[in-house]
Amino acid sequence: DCRYMFGDCEKDEDCCKHLGCKRKMKYCAWDFTFT
């Protein structure tokens, strides 16, 4: 399962599509992509 916005993460692959891992804060945030 992928992590949604503000979910815990270690790397970008942990997050759902269009989300990337903010390594400093360890949460998923939008990566500014639409496709």
Swiss-Prot record:
Source organism per UniProt: Pamphobeteus nigricolor
The keyword Aminoacyl-tRNA synthetase appears for this protein: no
Taxonomic path: Eukaryota, Metazoa, Ecdysozoa, Arthropoda, Chelicerata
Disulfide feature: 2-16, 9-21, 15-28
Name of this chain's protein: Mu-theraphotoxin-Pn3a
Localization of this protein: Secreted
UniProt biotechnology annotation: Can be used to study Cav3.3 calcium channels, since it is a unique isoform-selective modulator of T-type calcium channels.
Any one of the GO CC terms: extracellular region
Family assignment from sequence similarity: Belongs to the neurotoxin 10 (Hwtx-1) family. 28 (Jztx-11) subfamily.
Site positions per UniProt: May bind to extracellular S3-S4 region of the domain II of Cav3.3 channel: 17-18
Keywords recorded for this protein, A-Z: Disulfide bond, Ion channel impairing toxin, Knottin, Neurotoxin, Pharmaceutical, Secreted, Toxin, Voltage-gated sodium channel impairing toxin
Entry's Gene Ontology molecular function annotations: ion channel inhibitor activity; sodium channel regulator activity; toxin activity
